[in-house]
């Protein structure tokens, strides 16, 4: 598994075509097609998309957004953190550590991470070292975020 390489995905029509394979398998909430289409339309060259290819086939992907410290409502001391969204591995490739490789890549930035897990995915996130954030109604708006914190970071009191 040492040969798994996570790479930033280009914002182009080839990536858009590859994302369509995920929409067939994933839930609407996981669809990154609209996000990618908006980035293409806006000519936004800073891609938040990362993925793993086997040959020329994209088999796992996620969105990773950096949130600036001034908007940090989760961690102490206040700092930049990452929001990890829409992690998905195609069904034929699940159970082979590709999801773990994506999460480990996000952790390699040594910034706290927040994610909103899908139903039935809590076990995966717990294995990855994530914990439930203390719920705060105004901040979390009905979501149940999970967080991961590197050494020296703690959860903000609500």
Stretch-by-stretch model annotation:
Residues 89, 94-108:
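Conserved acetyl-CoA-binding loop-helix of GNAT-fold acetyltransferases
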Residues 85, 90, 118:
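Residue-level recognition of the GNAT/N-acetyltransferase active site
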Residues 103, 108-120:
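Conserved GNAT acetyl-CoA-binding A-motif
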Residues 1-41, 53:
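Short amphipathic alpha-helix that is part of the acyltransferase structural core
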Residues 118-143:
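Conserved active-site alpha-helix within GNAT-family acetyltransferase domains
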